[in-house]
Amino acid sequence: MIENAGIDYKELYLQMQSAVVALSKTLEEIQKENKNLKEENEYLKRKLFGTKSETSKSLGFEQLSLFDEAEAEANPDEEQFILEEVKFNKKKKYKGQLDDKLSKLPHIEVIMTLPESELVCPVCNSKLVPVGKKFVRHEIEFVPAKLKVRDVYTTTYECRKCRANGKSVMKSPGIPEPVIPHSYASAESVAFVMKQKFVNGVPLYRQESEWKQMGLDLSRTTMANWIIYSSEHWLKPLTDRMHGILLESKHAHADETPVQVLNEPGKKATTKSYMWVYSSIKESSYPIRLFVYAPNRCGYNPQIFFNGFHGTVISDAYSGYNNIEGCVNAYCWAHARRKFRDSLPNNLENAENTLPIIAMNKIKKLFAIEKEIEALSPDKKVKIRQLKSKPLIDDFFSWCKSNQNATASAKLSRAFKYVLNHEEGLRQYLYDGYIPMTNSLDERVIRPFTTGRKNWLFSASVSGAESSANAYSIIEIAKANGLDPYKYLTTIFTYLPSQDLIKNPEIIDEFLPWSKFVQKNCK
Protein backbone atom coordinates (compact mmCIF):
# COMPACT_ATOMS: atom_id res chain seq x y z
CA MET A 1 0.00 0.00 0.00
CA ILE A 2 1.39 3.35 -1.10
CA GLU A 3 1.22 6.01 1.53
CA ASN A 4 0.20 9.56 0.66
CA ALA A 5 3.55 10.82 1.96
CA GLY A 6 1.99 13.94 3.33
CA ILE A 7 0.37 15.09 0.04
CA ASP A 8 -2.19 17.83 0.54
CA TYR A 9 -4.92 16.66 -1.83
CA LYS A 10 -7.06 19.70 -1.19
CA GLU A 11 -4.24 22.02 -2.24
CA LEU A 12 -3.51 19.83 -5.26
CA TYR A 13 -7.18 19.94 -6.26
CA LEU A 14 -7.23 23.73 -6.00
CA GLN A 15 -4.08 23.97 -8.13
CA MET A 16 -5.54 21.69 -10.77
CA GLN A 17 -8.79 23.63 -10.73
CA SER A 18 -6.86 26.88 -11.15
CA ALA A 19 -4.90 25.36 -14.05
CA VAL A 20 -8.12 24.24 -15.74
CA VAL A 21 -9.59 27.74 -15.41
CA ALA A 22 -6.39 29.27 -16.84
CA LEU A 23 -6.35 26.79 -19.73
CA SER A 24 -10.02 27.42 -20.42
CA LYS A 25 -9.37 31.15 -20.50
CA THR A 26 -6.39 30.64 -22.83
CA LEU A 27 -8.48 28.42 -25.10
CA GLU A 28 -11.25 31.01 -25.17
CA GLU A 29 -8.76 33.71 -26.15
CA ILE A 30 -7.26 31.50 -28.87
CA GLN A 31 -10.72 30.71 -30.24
CA LYS A 32 -11.61 34.39 -30.23
CA GLU A 33 -8.37 35.29 -31.98
CA ASN A 34 -8.93 32.51 -34.51
CA LYS A 35 -12.43 33.79 -35.22
CA ASN A 36 -11.11 37.33 -35.70
CA LEU A 37 -8.40 36.09 -38.05
CA LYS A 38 -10.96 34.14 -40.08
CA GLU A 39 -13.13 37.24 -40.23
CA GLU A 40 -10.19 39.34 -41.37
CA ASN A 41 -9.24 36.71 -43.95
CA GLU A 42 -12.76 36.65 -45.39
CA TYR A 43 -12.81 40.45 -45.50
CA LEU A 44 -9.50 40.57 -47.37
CA LYS A 45 -10.71 37.93 -49.83
CA ARG A 46 -13.83 40.01 -50.49
CA LYS A 47 -11.64 43.06 -51.07
CA LEU A 48 -9.33 41.17 -53.42
CA PHE A 49 -11.68 38.91 -55.35
CA GLY A 50 -15.14 40.31 -54.70
CA THR A 51 -17.21 42.50 -56.97
CA LYS A 52 -15.95 46.05 -57.29
CA SER A 53 -19.39 47.63 -57.28
CA GLU A 54 -22.35 47.33 -54.95
CA THR A 55 -25.42 45.49 -56.23
CA SER A 56 -27.81 46.64 -53.53
CA LYS A 57 -29.93 49.72 -53.95
CA SER A 58 -30.35 50.01 -50.22
CA LEU A 59 -26.59 50.14 -49.79
CA GLY A 60 -26.35 52.69 -52.54
CA PHE A 61 -22.64 52.99 -51.83
CA GLU A 62 -19.82 53.05 -54.33
CA GLN A 63 -16.80 50.84 -53.66
CA LEU A 64 -14.69 52.79 -51.19
CA SER A 65 -11.04 51.91 -51.62
CA LEU A 66 -8.39 53.08 -49.19
CA PHE A 67 -7.73 56.52 -50.66
CA ASP A 68 -10.47 56.69 -53.26
CA GLU A 69 -13.71 57.00 -51.33
CA ALA A 70 -16.07 58.95 -53.54
CA GLU A 71 -19.16 60.18 -51.74
CA ALA A 72 -21.80 57.60 -52.60
CA GLU A 73 -25.07 59.42 -52.29
CA ALA A 74 -26.87 58.02 -55.31
CA ASN A 75 -30.26 56.40 -54.67
CA PRO A 76 -30.30 56.91 -50.89
CA ASP A 77 -34.08 56.71 -50.59
CA GLU A 78 -34.30 52.93 -50.06
CA GLU A 79 -34.41 52.48 -46.31
CA GLN A 80 -34.51 48.69 -46.03
CA PHE A 81 -31.80 46.28 -47.10
CA ILE A 82 -32.99 44.41 -50.19
CA LEU A 83 -30.63 42.73 -52.59
CA GLU A 84 -31.64 43.35 -56.17
CA GLU A 85 -30.38 42.28 -59.54
CA VAL A 86 -28.74 45.18 -61.34
CA LYS A 87 -30.41 45.97 -64.66
CA PHE A 88 -28.41 47.76 -67.32
CA ASN A 89 -30.58 49.88 -69.56
CA LYS A 90 -29.24 51.15 -72.85
CA LYS A 91 -28.76 54.88 -72.64
CA LYS A 92 -31.21 56.73 -74.83
CA LYS A 93 -29.64 58.94 -77.45
CA TYR A 94 -31.22 62.28 -78.14
CA LYS A 95 -31.22 64.17 -81.40
CA GLY A 96 -28.39 66.67 -81.50
CA GLN A 97 -26.38 64.91 -78.79
CA LEU A 98 -23.52 64.11 -81.18
CA ASP A 99 -23.57 67.64 -82.61
CA ASP A 100 -23.17 69.04 -79.10
CA LYS A 101 -20.28 66.67 -78.42
CA LEU A 102 -18.45 67.74 -81.60
CA SER A 103 -19.32 71.44 -81.47
CA LYS A 104 -16.05 72.49 -79.80
CA LEU A 105 -13.86 70.83 -82.43
CA PRO A 106 -12.83 72.54 -85.69
CA HIS A 107 -14.76 71.30 -88.72
CA ILE A 108 -13.68 70.96 -92.35
CA GLU A 109 -16.01 70.08 -95.20
CA VAL A 110 -15.19 67.18 -97.47
CA ILE A 111 -17.46 67.46 -100.53
CA MET A 112 -17.74 64.46 -102.81
CA THR A 113 -18.11 65.42 -106.50
CA LEU A 114 -18.39 63.59 -109.79
CA PRO A 115 -15.41 63.63 -112.15
CA GLU A 116 -15.76 65.83 -115.24
CA SER A 117 -16.23 62.78 -117.47
CA GLU A 118 -19.36 61.73 -115.56
CA LEU A 119 -21.09 65.15 -115.59
CA VAL A 120 -23.30 63.99 -118.46
CA CYS A 121 -27.07 63.43 -118.37
CA PRO A 122 -27.78 59.74 -119.05
CA VAL A 123 -31.02 60.73 -120.86
CA CYS A 124 -30.12 63.65 -123.17
CA ASN A 125 -26.33 63.90 -122.84
CA SER A 126 -26.55 67.49 -121.53
CA LYS A 127 -23.99 68.70 -118.94
CA LEU A 128 -24.96 68.21 -115.29
CA VAL A 129 -24.70 71.20 -112.93
CA PRO A 130 -24.63 71.16 -109.06
CA VAL A 131 -27.94 72.00 -107.40
CA GLY A 132 -27.12 71.32 -103.73
CA LYS A 133 -25.29 69.16 -101.25
CA LYS A 134 -26.55 66.62 -98.72
CA PHE A 135 -24.94 65.90 -95.33
CA VAL A 136 -23.85 62.28 -94.96
CA ARG A 137 -21.91 61.82 -91.70
CA HIS A 138 -19.31 63.11 -89.23
CA GLU A 139 -15.84 61.54 -89.03
CA ILE A 140 -13.21 62.23 -86.39
CA GLU A 141 -9.79 62.80 -87.93
CA PHE A 142 -6.76 62.20 -85.73
CA VAL A 143 -3.77 64.45 -86.46
CA PRO A 144 -0.60 62.91 -84.96
CA ALA A 145 1.62 65.22 -82.91
CA LYS A 146 4.56 66.75 -84.78
CA LEU A 147 7.67 68.51 -83.54
CA LYS A 148 9.24 71.62 -84.99
CA VAL A 149 12.15 73.78 -83.90
CA ARG A 150 11.71 77.49 -83.28
CA ASP A 151 14.99 79.24 -84.12
CA VAL A 152 14.76 82.48 -82.16
CA TYR A 153 16.57 85.53 -83.52
CA THR A 154 16.49 89.15 -82.47
CA THR A 155 16.66 92.02 -84.93
CA THR A 156 19.10 94.87 -84.32
CA TYR A 157 18.11 98.36 -85.49
CA GLU A 158 20.48 101.23 -86.19
CA CYS A 159 20.01 104.98 -86.70
CA ARG A 160 21.84 105.74 -89.97
CA LYS A 161 21.66 109.50 -89.45
CA CYS A 162 23.46 109.26 -86.10
CA ARG A 163 25.94 106.90 -87.69
CA ALA A 164 26.68 109.49 -90.39
CA ASN A 165 27.31 112.00 -87.59
CA GLY A 166 29.77 109.63 -85.95
CA LYS A 167 27.40 108.21 -83.31
CA SER A 168 26.42 104.58 -82.96
CA VAL A 169 22.77 104.25 -81.93
CA MET A 170 21.34 100.74 -81.97
CA LYS A 171 18.20 99.17 -80.55
CA SER A 172 16.94 95.61 -80.19
CA PRO A 173 13.62 94.23 -78.95
CA GLY A 174 13.39 92.64 -75.51
CA ILE A 175 13.76 88.88 -75.45
CA PRO A 176 11.30 86.85 -73.32
CA GLU A 177 13.07 84.76 -70.70
CA PRO A 178 13.06 81.00 -71.39
CA VAL A 179 11.29 78.59 -69.08
CA ILE A 180 14.67 76.96 -68.33
CA PRO A 181 17.93 78.88 -68.91
CA HIS A 182 20.42 77.41 -71.41
CA SER A 183 17.94 74.75 -72.49
CA TYR A 184 16.06 73.95 -75.68
CA ALA A 185 12.92 73.37 -73.60
CA SER A 186 9.93 75.52 -74.53
CA ALA A 187 6.90 76.40 -72.44
CA GLU A 188 4.83 74.04 -74.58
CA SER A 189 7.23 71.09 -74.35
CA VAL A 190 7.57 71.29 -70.55
CA ALA A 191 3.80 71.68 -70.19
CA PHE A 192 3.26 68.65 -72.44
CA VAL A 193 5.67 66.46 -70.43
CA MET A 194 3.88 67.47 -67.21
CA LYS A 195 0.46 66.89 -68.72
CA GLN A 196 1.45 63.43 -69.90
CA LYS A 197 2.88 62.44 -66.52
CA PHE A 198 0.48 64.09 -64.10
CA VAL A 199 -2.79 64.18 -66.07
CA ASN A 200 -2.51 61.09 -68.27
CA GLY A 201 -0.31 59.05 -65.93
CA VAL A 202 2.36 58.34 -68.57
CA PRO A 203 5.72 57.65 -66.86
CA LEU A 204 8.85 59.31 -68.24
CA TYR A 205 10.36 56.11 -69.65
CA ARG A 206 7.29 55.72 -71.91
CA GLN A 207 7.38 59.37 -72.86
CA GLU A 208 11.03 58.89 -73.82
CA SER A 209 10.04 56.35 -76.49
CA GLU A 210 7.16 58.54 -77.70
CA TRP A 211 9.46 61.53 -78.19
CA LYS A 212 11.87 59.30 -80.11
CA GLN A 213 9.05 58.20 -82.41
CA MET A 214 8.38 61.88 -83.10
CA GLY A 215 12.01 62.39 -84.08
CA LEU A 216 13.77 63.63 -80.92
CA ASP A 217 16.02 61.70 -78.53
CA LEU A 218 14.76 63.22 -75.28
CA SER A 219 15.96 61.28 -72.26
CA ARG A 220 13.86 60.68 -69.16
CA THR A 221 16.63 62.33 -67.11
CA THR A 222 16.26 65.53 -69.13
CA MET A 223 12.48 65.47 -68.74
CA ALA A 224 12.83 64.90 -64.98
CA ASN A 225 15.16 67.91 -64.76
CA TRP A 226 12.67 70.01 -66.72
CA ILE A 227 9.88 69.07 -64.29
CA ILE A 228 11.95 69.72 -61.17
CA TYR A 229 13.32 73.09 -62.33
CA SER A 230 10.00 74.40 -63.68
CA SER A 231 8.10 73.23 -60.63
CA GLU A 232 10.51 74.81 -58.17
CA HIS A 233 10.87 78.14 -59.98
CA TRP A 234 7.44 78.75 -61.54
CA LEU A 235 4.82 76.52 -59.86
CA LYS A 236 5.92 76.78 -56.24
CA PRO A 237 5.41 80.60 -56.06
CA LEU A 238 1.81 80.00 -57.14
CA THR A 239 1.17 77.14 -54.70
CA ASP A 240 2.73 79.19 -51.88
CA ARG A 241 0.42 82.10 -52.69
CA MET A 242 -2.64 79.85 -52.75
CA HIS A 243 -1.55 78.25 -49.47
CA GLY A 244 -1.80 81.70 -47.93
CA ILE A 245 -5.25 82.23 -49.44
CA LEU A 246 -6.45 78.87 -48.07
CA LEU A 247 -5.25 79.79 -44.57
CA GLU A 248 -7.46 82.90 -44.72
CA SER A 249 -10.57 80.77 -45.27
CA LYS A 250 -12.76 79.20 -42.58
CA HIS A 251 -12.99 75.63 -43.89
CA ALA A 252 -10.56 73.15 -45.45
CA HIS A 253 -10.45 69.49 -46.40
CA ALA A 254 -7.45 67.33 -45.48
CA ASP A 255 -6.33 63.84 -46.47
CA GLU A 256 -3.12 61.90 -47.06
CA THR A 257 -1.85 58.97 -49.11
CA PRO A 258 1.46 57.05 -49.11
CA VAL A 259 4.19 57.51 -51.70
CA GLN A 260 7.54 55.77 -52.06
CA VAL A 261 10.71 57.87 -52.40
CA LEU A 262 13.85 55.91 -53.23
CA ASN A 263 16.70 58.27 -52.38
CA GLU A 264 15.64 60.00 -49.19
CA PRO A 265 18.36 60.85 -46.66
CA GLY A 266 18.17 58.77 -43.49
CA LYS A 267 15.42 56.45 -44.76
CA LYS A 268 15.25 53.06 -46.44
CA ALA A 269 13.83 53.02 -49.96
CA THR A 270 10.98 50.77 -48.78
CA THR A 271 9.87 53.21 -46.06
CA LYS A 272 6.57 54.99 -46.63
CA SER A 273 6.50 58.71 -47.21
CA TYR A 274 3.28 60.68 -47.63
CA MET A 275 1.55 63.10 -49.92
CA TRP A 276 -0.82 65.34 -47.96
CA VAL A 277 -3.71 67.01 -49.77
CA TYR A 278 -5.48 70.14 -48.58
CA SER A 279 -8.46 71.68 -50.38
CA SER A 280 -10.91 74.52 -50.10
CA ILE A 281 -14.57 73.57 -49.73
CA LYS A 282 -16.98 73.27 -52.64
CA GLU A 283 -18.60 76.66 -51.91
CA SER A 284 -15.30 78.57 -51.91
CA SER A 285 -14.89 81.46 -54.35
CA TYR A 286 -11.28 80.35 -54.78
CA PRO A 287 -11.10 76.61 -55.55
CA ILE A 288 -7.73 75.43 -54.20
CA ARG A 289 -6.18 71.94 -54.19
CA LEU A 290 -2.71 71.65 -52.64
CA PHE A 291 -0.46 68.59 -52.54
CA VAL A 292 2.36 68.72 -49.98
CA TYR A 293 5.08 66.08 -49.72
CA ALA A 294 6.30 64.93 -46.29
CA PRO A 295 8.65 62.09 -45.27
CA ASN A 296 6.17 60.69 -42.74
CA ARG A 297 2.59 60.70 -41.47
CA CYS A 298 3.29 62.57 -38.23
CA GLY A 299 0.76 65.06 -36.91
CA TYR A 300 3.21 67.96 -37.05
CA ASN A 301 2.86 68.01 -40.87
CA PRO A 302 -0.74 69.33 -40.87
CA GLN A 303 0.12 71.46 -37.84
CA ILE A 304 2.82 73.21 -39.87
CA PHE A 305 0.57 73.56 -42.91
CA PHE A 306 -2.36 74.98 -40.91
CA ASN A 307 -0.24 77.38 -38.85
CA GLY A 308 -2.32 80.57 -38.66
CA PHE A 309 -5.54 78.89 -39.80
CA HIS A 310 -8.64 79.40 -37.65
CA GLY A 311 -11.54 77.31 -38.84
CA THR A 312 -12.81 73.79 -39.46
CA VAL A 313 -10.72 70.96 -40.88
CA ILE A 314 -12.77 68.22 -42.56
CA SER A 315 -10.97 64.87 -42.47
CA ASP A 316 -11.28 61.12 -42.02
CA ALA A 317 -10.62 61.36 -38.25
CA TYR A 318 -6.96 60.41 -38.53
CA SER A 319 -5.40 61.39 -35.19
CA GLY A 320 -2.73 63.49 -36.93
CA TYR A 321 -5.32 66.24 -37.44
CA ASN A 322 -6.39 66.38 -33.79
CA ASN A 323 -3.84 68.84 -32.41
CA ILE A 324 -4.01 71.68 -34.93
CA GLU A 325 -4.12 74.87 -32.89
CA GLY A 326 -7.21 77.00 -33.44
CA CYS A 327 -9.03 74.35 -35.49
CA VAL A 328 -12.31 72.47 -35.11
CA ASN A 329 -12.40 68.91 -36.46
CA ALA A 330 -15.30 67.71 -38.60
CA TYR A 331 -15.27 64.04 -39.54
CA CYS A 332 -16.38 62.10 -42.58
CA TRP A 333 -19.58 60.05 -42.45
CA ALA A 334 -18.49 58.04 -45.50
CA HIS A 335 -15.66 56.63 -43.39
CA ALA A 336 -18.07 55.82 -40.57
CA ARG A 337 -20.34 54.03 -43.02
CA ARG A 338 -17.38 52.16 -44.45
CA LYS A 339 -16.50 50.75 -41.01
CA PHE A 340 -19.91 49.08 -40.84
CA ARG A 341 -19.79 47.97 -44.46
CA ASP A 342 -16.46 46.24 -43.82
CA SER A 343 -18.08 44.30 -40.97
CA LEU A 344 -20.86 42.84 -43.15
CA PRO A 345 -21.32 39.06 -42.87
CA ASN A 346 -20.06 36.95 -45.76
CA ASN A 347 -23.52 35.59 -46.50
CA LEU A 348 -25.92 38.45 -47.21
CA GLU A 349 -28.99 36.29 -47.88
CA ASN A 350 -30.48 36.79 -44.41
CA ALA A 351 -28.63 39.94 -43.45
CA GLU A 352 -31.59 42.30 -43.14
CA ASN A 353 -31.58 42.41 -39.35
CA THR A 354 -27.84 42.25 -38.72
CA LEU A 355 -26.25 45.12 -36.85
CA PRO A 356 -24.06 46.32 -39.77
CA ILE A 357 -27.08 46.59 -42.08
CA ILE A 358 -29.16 48.39 -39.46
CA ALA A 359 -26.31 50.86 -38.91
CA MET A 360 -25.84 51.44 -42.63
CA ASN A 361 -29.54 52.04 -43.19
CA LYS A 362 -29.58 54.58 -40.34
CA ILE A 363 -26.65 56.41 -41.94
CA LYS A 364 -28.34 56.13 -45.33
CA LYS A 365 -31.24 58.24 -44.09
CA LEU A 366 -28.77 61.02 -43.27
CA PHE A 367 -27.34 60.89 -46.79
CA ALA A 368 -30.85 61.05 -48.23
CA ILE A 369 -31.47 64.33 -46.38
CA GLU A 370 -28.18 65.76 -47.68
CA LYS A 371 -29.22 64.86 -51.22
CA GLU A 372 -32.48 66.77 -50.77
CA ILE A 373 -30.83 69.95 -49.46
CA GLU A 374 -27.77 69.92 -51.72
CA ALA A 375 -28.77 73.08 -53.61
CA LEU A 376 -29.86 75.11 -50.57
CA SER A 377 -27.95 77.93 -48.90
CA PRO A 378 -25.75 77.10 -45.87
CA ASP A 379 -28.21 78.78 -43.48
CA LYS A 380 -31.13 76.74 -44.79
CA LYS A 381 -29.04 73.57 -44.64
CA VAL A 382 -28.40 74.12 -40.93
CA LYS A 383 -32.11 74.61 -40.22
CA ILE A 384 -33.09 71.41 -42.01
CA ARG A 385 -30.21 69.45 -40.49
CA GLN A 386 -31.32 70.52 -37.03
CA LEU A 387 -34.92 69.65 -37.81
CA LYS A 388 -34.45 66.35 -39.67
CA SER A 389 -30.89 65.07 -39.29
CA LYS A 390 -30.23 65.77 -35.61
CA PRO A 391 -33.00 63.47 -34.29
CA LEU A 392 -31.71 60.69 -36.56
CA ILE A 393 -28.15 61.22 -35.35
CA ASP A 394 -29.27 61.25 -31.71
CA ASP A 395 -31.05 57.95 -32.35
CA PHE A 396 -28.02 56.52 -34.18
CA PHE A 397 -25.55 57.21 -31.38
CA SER A 398 -28.01 56.02 -28.73
CA TRP A 399 -28.45 52.79 -30.70
CA CYS A 400 -24.65 52.40 -31.06
CA LYS A 401 -24.14 52.78 -27.31
CA SER A 402 -26.82 50.16 -26.63
CA ASN A 403 -25.38 47.63 -29.09
CA GLN A 404 -21.63 48.16 -28.87
CA ASN A 405 -21.19 45.12 -26.60
CA ALA A 406 -23.74 42.92 -28.36
CA THR A 407 -21.34 41.47 -30.94
CA ALA A 408 -18.47 39.01 -31.03
CA SER A 409 -17.24 40.41 -34.35
CA ALA A 410 -13.96 42.30 -33.96
CA LYS A 411 -14.64 44.40 -37.06
CA LEU A 412 -18.10 45.38 -35.90
CA SER A 413 -16.74 46.22 -32.44
CA ARG A 414 -14.18 48.48 -34.10
CA ALA A 415 -16.95 50.12 -36.13
CA PHE A 416 -18.93 50.95 -32.98
CA LYS A 417 -15.77 52.17 -31.25
CA TYR A 418 -14.90 54.36 -34.24
CA VAL A 419 -18.20 56.23 -34.39
CA LEU A 420 -18.54 56.59 -30.61
CA ASN A 421 -14.98 57.88 -30.23
CA HIS A 422 -15.58 60.46 -32.99
CA GLU A 423 -19.14 61.47 -32.15
CA GLU A 424 -18.31 65.15 -31.62
CA GLY A 425 -16.59 65.48 -34.99
CA LEU A 426 -19.31 63.55 -36.80
CA ARG A 427 -21.92 65.96 -35.38
CA GLN A 428 -20.09 69.12 -36.52
CA TYR A 429 -21.86 69.36 -39.86
CA LEU A 430 -25.17 69.83 -38.03
CA TYR A 431 -24.11 73.30 -36.88
CA ASP A 432 -22.40 74.74 -39.98
CA GLY A 433 -23.98 74.66 -43.43
CA TYR A 434 -20.58 75.01 -45.10
CA ILE A 435 -19.35 71.71 -43.63
CA PRO A 436 -20.14 68.76 -45.91
CA MET A 437 -21.16 65.40 -44.55
CA THR A 438 -18.11 63.69 -46.07
CA ASN A 439 -14.52 64.34 -47.04
CA SER A 440 -15.17 63.08 -50.57
CA LEU A 441 -13.94 66.27 -52.24
CA ASP A 442 -10.37 65.69 -51.05
CA GLU A 443 -10.62 62.00 -51.86
CA ARG A 444 -11.56 62.84 -55.46
CA VAL A 445 -8.60 65.22 -55.62
CA ILE A 446 -6.29 62.39 -54.51
CA ARG A 447 -7.66 59.99 -57.12
CA PRO A 448 -5.47 61.17 -60.08
CA PHE A 449 -2.39 60.89 -57.86
CA THR A 450 -3.20 57.33 -56.76
CA THR A 451 -4.00 56.37 -60.37
CA GLY A 452 -0.74 57.88 -61.62
CA ARG A 453 1.18 56.22 -58.80
CA LYS A 454 0.22 52.80 -60.20
CA ASN A 455 2.11 53.71 -63.37
CA TRP A 456 5.22 55.46 -62.08
CA LEU A 457 5.28 53.57 -58.71
CA PHE A 458 7.74 55.86 -56.90
CA SER A 459 9.66 59.13 -56.88
CA ALA A 460 13.41 58.85 -57.28
CA SER A 461 14.24 61.73 -54.93
CA VAL A 462 12.80 64.21 -52.47
CA SER A 463 13.08 66.99 -55.06
CA GLY A 464 11.16 64.78 -57.48
CA ALA A 465 8.40 64.18 -54.92
CA GLU A 466 8.18 67.90 -54.11
CA SER A 467 8.03 68.84 -57.79
CA SER A 468 5.29 66.24 -58.29
CA ALA A 469 3.36 67.82 -55.42
CA ASN A 470 3.53 71.26 -57.04
CA ALA A 471 2.60 69.88 -60.47
CA TYR A 472 -0.40 67.93 -59.14
CA SER A 473 -1.48 71.02 -57.20
CA ILE A 474 -1.50 73.29 -60.26
CA ILE A 475 -3.17 70.68 -62.46
CA GLU A 476 -5.95 69.88 -59.97
CA ILE A 477 -6.43 73.60 -59.26
CA ALA A 478 -6.76 74.18 -63.01
CA LYS A 479 -9.47 71.52 -63.24
CA ALA A 480 -11.31 72.94 -60.23
CA ASN A 481 -11.35 76.39 -61.86
CA GLY A 482 -12.56 75.18 -65.24
CA LEU A 483 -9.17 75.56 -66.96
CA ASP A 484 -7.33 73.37 -69.43
CA PRO A 485 -4.30 72.14 -67.42
CA TYR A 486 -2.02 72.15 -70.48
CA LYS A 487 -3.00 75.71 -71.42
CA TYR A 488 -2.57 76.89 -67.83
CA LEU A 489 0.89 75.33 -67.54
CA THR A 490 1.90 76.76 -70.92
CA THR A 491 0.72 80.23 -69.92
CA ILE A 492 2.66 80.08 -66.65
CA PHE A 493 5.85 78.89 -68.35
CA THR A 494 5.51 81.44 -71.16
CA TYR A 495 5.00 84.62 -69.14
CA LEU A 496 6.08 84.07 -65.53
CA PRO A 497 9.84 83.64 -66.24
CA SER A 498 9.98 87.23 -67.53
CA GLN A 499 8.49 88.66 -64.32
CA ASP A 500 10.56 89.94 -61.40
CA LEU A 501 8.74 88.38 -58.45
CA ILE A 502 11.27 89.72 -55.96
CA LYS A 503 10.68 93.37 -56.86
CA ASN A 504 7.02 92.91 -57.74
CA PRO A 505 5.65 89.98 -55.68
CA GLU A 506 2.07 91.14 -56.29
CA ILE A 507 2.41 90.18 -59.97
CA ILE A 508 1.90 86.55 -58.98
CA ASP A 509 -1.81 87.31 -58.50
CA GLU A 510 -2.12 87.85 -62.26
CA PHE A 511 -1.32 84.15 -62.71
CA LEU A 512 -3.81 82.78 -60.17
CA PRO A 513 -6.40 80.53 -61.83
CA TRP A 514 -9.33 82.87 -61.23
CA SER A 515 -7.62 86.01 -62.60
CA LYS A 516 -9.13 87.59 -65.72
CA PHE A 517 -5.90 87.03 -67.66
CA VAL A 518 -5.81 83.30 -66.91
CA GLN A 519 -9.54 82.76 -67.33
CA LYS A 520 -9.39 84.43 -70.75
CA ASN A 521 -6.40 82.46 -72.05
CA CYS A 522 -6.62 79.02 -70.43
CA LYS A 523 -10.15 77.75 -70.92
Short names for language-model regions:
Residues M1-P181, A224, H253-A254, R385-K388:
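Short, flexible loop/hinge motifs at secondary-structure junctions
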Residues E3, K10, T156-E158, R163-K523:
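Catalytic center-proximal scaffold of phosphoryl-transfer enzymes
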